[in-house]
Amino acid sequence: MEASLKVQAGLAERRDLQVAIAGDLHDQWDRSDEELLLALAPDGLLVVGDLSNGKGRIPRALAQLPLPVACVLGNHDSGHDPTGESLTRQLALLGERHCGWGLRELRPPGLAVVGGRPCTAGGGYHLSKAMRAVYGPVELEESVERICAAALRADPSLPLVLLAHSGPAGLGSQARDPCGRDWKQPACDWGDQDLALAIARIRRHRPVPLVVFGHMHHTLRRGGGERVSFCRDRQGTMYLNTASVPRHGVDLQGRALRHLSW
C-alpha cells in the first residue's frame, strides 16, 4: 500500500508524499531496518506500536533515526507493568515522536499526524492499569475529545493522518475484517469506539483521508487465512492495517525480508 498523500509546497506546487509505516514490531527492529529506510529515503516513518514489551531498545533506536518519526504505543508496550513506570520510560525515550492523544506535525515534509488512544488493546474502550497510572482515569468521552482537539489544532493546509494502535469500530464484524476478533468465537468487531466517534466528529471540520493502525495481525488464528488489511468507506477515508507479524522473515532463496507498508 503506497501512502500517496498530497502535501502543499509553497502556494501552488503540490507533490506526492511518500510515507513508510512500520506495523507491530514485537521486538523485530534492528540495523537492517534502519539501513533499509536510509536506502528507501521516505519522507517520514509512522510506527503503530507494540514495540518490544516495555523494553527501551527500540524506542531509543527510533529516537535516533535521521528522518521524521511519529509513533503511538500499543498494548504490549506497558511491559505488563501495572505501575506505569515502564510506560513512562518509553514515553520519555520517544519524546515528541509519541503522538498518542496528541498532534505531531512533521515539518518537513509537511504532514499532520494525530494519535489515537495510547496502549489500546481494542474491544471498544478500556484503560489498562498502566494507562490509568500514567494518564489518570480518562473516560470514553474525554478520549474522543482529546483526539478531536488534536486534529483541530493541525494546520489545515497539511494532509491529516490518524495514527492508532487499534483501528476504529465500524469496519466489520467478521474475523477477517480489518479489526475483526479472530482468536475467540464468536467473531466480532474489536475496533476502538473512541476512535470511531472521533473520526465522525473531525469530519465535521475537515476531511480524514487516512487512518493507519495495527494490533489485529494479518494472519488469522486457527488457519483462518489472511485479514483484509485495507478498505475505504463511503466518505472516502482509507483504513490501513499494517500489522504484518512477524515483520522479519526470509524468502525462498534465504534472503532477508523486512515488512513496511508504503
Features from the language model and the residues they span:
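Binuclear metal-dependent hydrolase catalytic cores centered on His/Asp/Glu-rich metal-binding motifs
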Residues: P109-P159, Q185-G191
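N-terminal active-site segment of His-dependent metallophosphoesterases
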Residues: M1-A70, S78-S86
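Active-site-proximal beta-strand elements of phosphoester/diester hydrolases
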Residues: D16-L25, G110-G124, V161-H165, T237-V245
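Active-site-proximal segments of metal-dependent phosphoesterases and phosphodiesterases across multiple
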Residues: L158-P207
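Binuclear metal-dependent phosphoesterase catalytic core
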Residues: E2-R15, R104-P109, R201, P207, ...
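Glycine/small-residue-rich loop that forms an oxyanion/phosphate-binding "nest" at active or ligand-binding sites
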Residues: D81-R104
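Active-site neighborhood of phospho(di)ester-bond hydrolases with catalytic His/Asp-centered motifs
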Residues: I21-D24, L45-D50, V69-H76, H98-W101, ...
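Active-site environment of divalent metal-dependent phosphoester hydrolases
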Residues: H26-S32, S52-R57, H76-T83, E105, ...
